[in-house]
A protein has these predicted regions:
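Alpha-helical phosphate/pyrophosphate-handling elements in metalloenzyme active cores
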Residues: 34-64, 158-190
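Alpha-helical scaffolds flanking conserved acidic
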Residues: 59-77, 184-199, 257-266
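A short mid-domain helix/strand-loop element embedded in enzyme catalytic domains
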Residues: 137-158, 162-173
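Histidine- and acidic-residue-rich, metal-dependent catalytic cores
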Residues: 169, 173-176, 198, 227-256
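Acidic catalytic motifs of isoprenoid enzymes
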Residues: 54-124, 197
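Divalent-cation-assisted or electrostatically stabilized phosphate/pyrophosphate-binding catalytic cores
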Residues: 39-40, 91-102, 164, 210-236, ...
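Histidine/acidic-rich helix-loop-helix segments that form or flank divalent-metal centers
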Residues: 8, 104-140, 191, 236-293, ...
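Conserved N-terminal diphosphate/IPP-binding helix and adjacent helical/loop segment
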Residues: 2-34, 38-45, 143-146
Length: 324
């Protein structure tokens, strides 16, 4: 950051680093699903956000509500407002559950932002997700896989399962809100920047850095063509004002010179790298971790019986030949 001392830059690095464990959990919303509706939690939040914006809700309100829900979901997963209300929990108890989950992970978020987000954890009536009207590009981004890890001149490294663009955009939008105070940015603006930064991929398949390099000086024209297609859909669904706001944030994130650009680009690069950490963590996962670190056979009335069965089956870490 310009005009800051080394000590200030070090402190800023520490504050961003403090958020990484929370970001890792929030990012897992790309991989959590429920039975009653299709798509990951992140994909559903992307669809919900666009539906709210297109029906005229203020960007700031959508940004705060969806970011608060994403933080609470770090521990609650798919146990969201609608699920808890359908189970018969009173509204005040639903609020307590949501805030308990939020508080369990939100400590690294600056206190002033944390308190404002927490206020948005309220059980508002929700429309069935399948009935939410959204522009066509929202569905296409949900179907468009991310390219993964590519580099010109090298074979493509395909990582499975791929995240989709709706999941990535939603995660970046939430990260950017959580980083907004650090960079002096407005939460609503950085949230919208996250939602719109891959609009062109609604029509342009993601071939990564490798494919883009093959387009050479035609890359900009191709991206502009498909971005305009999505923006036209957005204007038809949400009006000219929403389109203008989207265009403003697209211009703003062409660089990292201003507060919006810095918060957005910090969120974007963190999500890209944390996604790679996810693949690495998944590939190195062991049964020992499940049993010992994650307490797979957890406390309860039948824990001792479970452990005795695993011992007889030679499936405990203490037994020789474990895992064979």
């Amino acid at each position: 950051m310009r005009g800051t001392s080394e000590a200030e830059r070090a402190a800023a690095r520490d504050r961003v680093g403090d958020l990484v464990p929370l970001f890792t959990e929030v990012g897992d919303a790309k991989r959590v699903r429920v039975a009653h509706t299709p798509g990951s939690l992140a994909e559903r939040a992307f669809r919900r956000s666009w539906a709210a914006l297109c029906r005229g809700e203020a960007v700031e309100s959508v940004a705060r509500r969806e970011s608060a829900r994403a933080v609470a979901a770090a521990r609650l997963g798919g146990l969201d407002v609608g699920t808890l209300l359908r189970a018969g929990l009173p509204k005040d108890e639903v609020v307590r559950v949501l805030r308990r989950s939020f508080d369990a992970v939100a400590e690294p978020v600056p206190e002033s932002l944390r308190s404002r987000l927490r206020e948005f954890l309220v059980p508002e009536p929700e429309e069935p997700e399948g009935s939410l009207p959204v522009p066509d590009f929202v569905q296409r981004l949900a179907r468009q896989p991310r390219a993964g890890c590519t580099r010109p001149g090298r074979p493509r490294l395909v990582l499975e399962p791929p995240e989709n663009h709706a999941e990535h955009c939603m995660t970046v939008a939430v990260y950017a809100v959580l980083l907004s105070e650090e960079f002096g940015a407005e939460p609503g603006r950085v949230f919208l920047a996250g939602l719109v930064h891959h609009l062109h991929n609604a029509g342009m398949p993601d071939s990564g850095f490798t494919g883009e390099a093959m387009l050479g000086d035609k890359l900009g024209a191709v991206m502009d063509r498909y971005r305009e297609e999505a923006l036209t859909e957005l204007e038809a669904s949400g009006g000219a004002e929403l389109r203008r706001a989207a265009e403003r944030e697209i211009r703003e994130i062409e660089t990292a010179d201003g507060p919006t650009g810095r918060a957005f680009h910090a969120a974007d690069v963190l999500d890209r790298v944390l996604q790679m950490h996810h693949y690495a963590r998944e590939a190195s996962f062991t049964v020992d971790q499940a049993l010992e670190e994650m307490d797979l056979v957890h406390d309860g009335p039948v824990k001792s019986f479970h452990e005795s069965v695993l011992a007889r089956a030679n499936l405990t870490p203490a037994n020789d030949g474990y895992g064979r």
